[in-house]
Amino acid sequence: MDLIFDFSELCGRIIARYGNYAKFADAIGMSRAQLSERLNNKRPFKPEEIVFICSPDILNIPDTEIGSYFFTPKV
């Protein structure tokens, strides 16, 4: 059984900083379809994608908070 993650906190941060998913996808060099697959648990985020997304230039997520954005199980 695959673990399903709750990306609601990540989605909120994306909208707060970029206004919509399309602008965010463009900023990280990912298609909207690829981003949608990841946010809907169809494909996992790659470690290097997580590092880039959390960087100060993108979402500025501190290392200590990465777990709550990417690894919170959906209940």
Language model regions located:
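Residues in the recognition helix of alpha-helical DNA-binding motifs
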Residues: A27, R38, Y69
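Short amphipathic recognition helices of helix-turn-helix/homeodomain-type DNA-binding modules
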Residues: E65-V75
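A short, Lys/Arg-rich alpha-helix, primarily the initiator
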Residues: M1-A22, A27
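Recognition helix of helix-turn-helix/homeodomain-like DNA-binding domains
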Residues: M30-F45
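Residue at a beta-strand N-cap/secondary-structure junction
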Residues: Y18, P44-P47
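DNA major-groove recognition helix of helix-turn-helix/homeodomain DNA-binding modules
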Residues: E48-I66
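Helix-turn-helix DNA-binding elements, focusing on the entry/boundary residues of the two helices
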Residues: Y21, R32, I50
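Residue-level detection of the helix-turn-helix DNA-binding "recognition helix"
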Residues: G12, N40-K42, V51
